[in-house]
Each structure stands twice: as structure tokens, then as C-alpha cells.
Amino acid sequence: MEMPMDLTEVKLRRKDVFEGKIMTVHVDDVRLPNGEEATREVVDHVDGAAVLALDEANRVLVVRQYRYVFGKVLDELPAGKLDPGEDPVTGALRELKEETGAEPETFLPLGKLLPAPGCYGETLHLFLAKGLKFNQQQLDPDEFLNVERVPFDEMVHRCVNGEIDDAKTVAAVLRAKVLLNL
């Protein structure tokens, strides 16, 4: 049996193209495993967290918000970017409270998600929240959204049939279904 090839690409040069509040775009020249050179366009984005929050009736808190990039309203789990140095659990709890007003008694990890590892450097941390107590939303000034409650089985169906195409939502719902036998 042949030894597996070392698949590592080595960065040779980096050119910074854009630096914004939440992302930086680079163009990197790399050395490929075969010794040739190639160019990689890279978007470094701050990490984020998303929460699959279930109420006492096993309904999912779904955030409906307009996504400018796609020009439409999407159904998603409560989520957001982590503050610099912020622990993923702390950030996820903060986002859940800000967007829905919910605070959970039980909070479990559902793993991580790499949304587009070919060019996009972001890790999303996924969590499950149960035993919810509700207070007021604490939305950011530029945040406009509606919160709906959708039965968990309906969310599974909507994720599987493609009605919901947000990666973090699909991943968290299906992981919860399989891992926790919900």
C-alpha cells in the first residue's frame, strides 16, 4: 500500500486586499504538494456561534431576518459573531439573549461548522439550549428581525427538503436530530 501524500500547502507570500470590521481579504501564493505554485483567495472572518433553542413544547426559536447579500428574508437560528477574545459559549448565550430574550437552563455543544473551508476562514460554534426563560430582546441598533416558534419535526423537514438553506441552521438541526434522538 502506497504512503499517503502530504497534502499541506505552504504559504509563500500574502497580499492584503481589504480589511473591514468583520473580515479581511488576502491573496496568498502557496507551494502545492507537487512543488508547483498556486494562488489562494482567502476571506478571514471573525468566528461566530449559533443556538438551536427549544421551548417547552419542543419548538425551535427561529429568527427571520433580511439578508442583504441574498436579497431576501431567511429563517435562521439565533446567531452572531464572537467579540474579540470571547468564549464561544459566552458569545452564543449573549446572541440568544439579544435576539430572542431567551436564557436557557441547559446548554449543550453541537460541535463546530466550517461554512466554506475552500476560501472562508470562519468557525461557527453550534449549541443546543433548553429550559428557556424569556425576557426582552436586546437587539443591536442595526438589527431588525422577527422570532417565530417552529415545531422541531417541521424544522427537520424544512432543512431536509431545502426550504431552509442556511448552513448553520441545517447543520445544528440535523445534528440535534441524530445525536440527541430528538
Where are these regions (language model features)?
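Hydrophobic residues on conserved beta-strands that form the core of alpha/beta folds
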Residues: V25-V27, T39, V63, L77, ...
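Unchanged
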Residues: A38, D47-A50, D55, K81-A167
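Short glycine-centered helix-capping/turn motifs at secondary-structure transition points
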Residues: G162, V178-L180
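Acidic, metal-coordinating catalytic segment for phosphate/diphosphate chemistry
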Residues: R14-A50, E56-A57
